[in-house]
Amino acid sequence: MLPLLKKLYLTFARSSRIIITLVIIDQLSKWWFIDNLRWKSGLMLKVTSFLNMVYTWNYGISFGLMREYYQYSNAIFLITNTIIVCYLYYLMIRSKTIGSFAGYSFVIGGAVGNLIDRFFRGAVFDFIHFHYQNYSFPVFNLADCFIIIGVIILIEDYYSTKKVIEEKAKGNYDNAQIEAMAEKIRNTDKGGNDKIASLQN
């Protein structure tokens, strides 16, 4: 029981630093742009030819999806997102690699940042808008970026871990083959010691 509690405490302490830092960055960026963009003409600040900072409230999910269901979305998304965050935290506690730990921390940090918006403001504030010629990418925020970064880290960690496991399994298989051949030589050849040594080298 004590080792489990210790693990939970250490996981909470380590993840909290990452998650809280990401939430603070997300909330400060939203606060700054909410305070400054509302006074801009057209509620927009042009940064480059392909990047604008815009004043947008998202009543749907990430990147403005499902915003047409705004009359139901806030309560539903508050409940479902809270459940998802709790489940992700459970997975993070069980994570066995630094990559998966970091990935879950980023996803949780981004999700919590948007949850705070939805709880206190009734919608998520989005302000980053990429566009090129006739193509316009959905408006998003830093919390969405953190979620994407976390997912990328988790995918990379999954394939890296899978590769290590496969290589280890292959190594164990090769060792088993050598042992089987050595045993066969011992049983069939009195002078098998030299051959066994050559196999092991």
From Swiss-Prot:
Keyword annotations of the record: Aspartyl protease, Cell inner membrane, Cell membrane, Hydrolase, Membrane, Protease, Transmembrane, Transmembrane helix
Membrane-crossing segments per the record: 73-93, 97-117, 135-155
Classification via InterPro entries: Peptidase_A8 (IPR001872)
Cellular component terms per the entry's GO annotation: plasma membrane
GO biological process: proteolysis
Pathway in which the depicted protein is active: Protein modification; lipoprotein biosynthesis (signal peptide cleavage)
NCBIfam families hit by this protein: lspA
Protein name (database record): Lipoprotein signal peptidase
Organism: Rickettsia conorii (strain ATCC VR-613 / Malish 7)
